[in-house]
């Protein structure tokens, strides 16, 4: 939600940049870990990393990304790998869009 992000930026001032950098770095690492775990079907790792990105994304208002990560988390809990690569690809695309929006606010 762009309005929420603008509100956060106005509220946090200079600390908003640090928040964005931390979010981007954390999500990049978690998504990298999840991608590796998907390749070898380590469902507990997939679940953990998807949960982390979901929570961080909700906190900054990236609800679409949080929803996709929730779907991945559910698949991992059920050890359901049907279409998991396609879902992960959608997550990566959504994260790229979120990252671009955040960087545009800096």
At which residue positions do the language-model features occur?
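Two-component system phosphorelay core
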Residues: 1-106
